[in-house]
């Protein structure tokens, strides 16, 4: 599985593809000590977080010297929404990291399982995005320009070149198109639960749990840095059901979920 992320700024170039249609109209900011994946790492198809336990539920030392899990039933790198935990950031789930792209649903499933989590369901993702207030956007019911990374310039992509993935040429083209912002840098693009960048930035794979025009087991949700097809702004219900689990594109990423420990 070749994971693609970038460690530096890229040219502001991207495009929206026809499949990106919208079918349905308490935080800790400590920086992770490890470096984010670099462009060189991406070229080699390496994921320098795959062997890390940073996404495991850490055991904290209590006042009696015993070990306990963090409050809320979720790891410190996740936030709680109802009876489940969801990654605070898009994979690789690091504040200030560059979100993975060119990910298929199969890739996403494998990565989440390797980190002792699972791919979020559609219902979970929407619940974490809209919150108990059932917001249209993670931050409220009215779109605010610049609040999330959803207004980058549209530019045509060479799909035939990307189809050669994981060739060096395909990776270089994906880099040219990459306009995701570092995870968490849009501080106001935060849901009620505390999840960042849920609309815009990279489009995220989830397990389909609702009826759609196509019956693929996975869908993409939240649109990406150039918004949604037709100029629509990404909402907590913006979905793309047009692709099977092997599909990958220059803006496709994901985040992971897991069951929460104990009652909220």
List each model region and its residues:
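Short glycine/proline-rich turn/loop motifs
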Residues: 89-95, 177-178, 236-241
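Short, P/G- and charge-enriched loop/turn segments at secondary-structure junctions
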Residues: 73-75, 239-245
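Functional-site microenvironments in short loops/helix caps that host divalent-cation chemistry
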Residues: 107-109, 114, 118-237, 250
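Residues within well-ordered beta-strands of beta-sheet-rich folds
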Residues: 85, 206, 255-257
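Ser/Thr-rich, Pro/Gly/Ala-heavy low-complexity intrinsically disordered linkers and tails
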Residues: 1-64
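Acidic glycine-/aspartate-rich tracts in secreted/extracellular proteins
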Residues: 90-93, 132-133, 207-211, 260-263
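Short, structured beta-strand segments at or near domain termini in extracellular proteins/domains
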Residues: 250-264
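A short glycine-rich, aromatic-capped structural motif
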Residues: 59-123, 128-129, 200
